[in-house]
Amino acid sequence: MSSKSRTKLFAAQKKILDTRAASQYNNSVRLQPPKVVTPSKWLTPEYDGRYRGRYLQMAKDAARRHGIPENLFLRLVQQESNWNPQAKSHKGALGLAQLMPQTARLLRVDPLDPAENLEGGARYLKEQYRTFGTWRLALAAYNAGPGAVKKYGGVPPFRETQNYVKVIGGG
């Protein structure tokens, strides 16, 4: 076999091996870097609240840790508690992100600890986003509960929830 033929044979074999290796790599979840899911830029209006205290940075950090648009989470906390860590709703929701006691237990956070409450609120909102696929429906589920969003196949026809989604999401 001539050296020219060997070179062609080697090139052909190398091409086959490269193609196989690329195919195996593309099909291997283990070797691929983790997929980064960037939350959609859901045109959330800028946070325009006056609050600039210590909980603001905690809320921003919690939003970033969980991949939530910062302005969305800041507006949620503003709407939920007006940045009052001792806030308690008529339905029993507690703290900055207004977690229901049973939700806080499931998330294993102390709803009266501001840092844990914000962490729990961000985790819960992200969980709703993963379940429903849009921030609009995640907000509706955060407010009315995931069961209501499932039951109605979208934002429930409750005035409070519709207003909540509109105020936080901007439309």
Which role fits each region the language model picked out?
Residues 45-56, 65-66, 70, 89-93, ...:
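Solvent-exposed, acidic/flexible segments
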Residues 86-109, 117-125, 140, 146-147, ...:
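Substrate-binding/active-site groove segments that recognize
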Residues 1-75, 171:
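Cell-wall glycan-active module
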Residues 58-60, 64-84, 118-123, 138-145, ...:
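Short, functionally critical alpha-helical segments immediately adjacent to catalytic or ligand/cofactor-binding
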Residues 125-128, 132, 149:
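Hydrophobic recognition helices of helix-based DNA-binding modules
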Residues 79, 128, 171:
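Mid-sequence acidic-hydrophobic segments that form the walls
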Residues 152-153:
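LysM (lysin motif) carbohydrate-binding repeats in extracellular/periplasmic proteins that recognize
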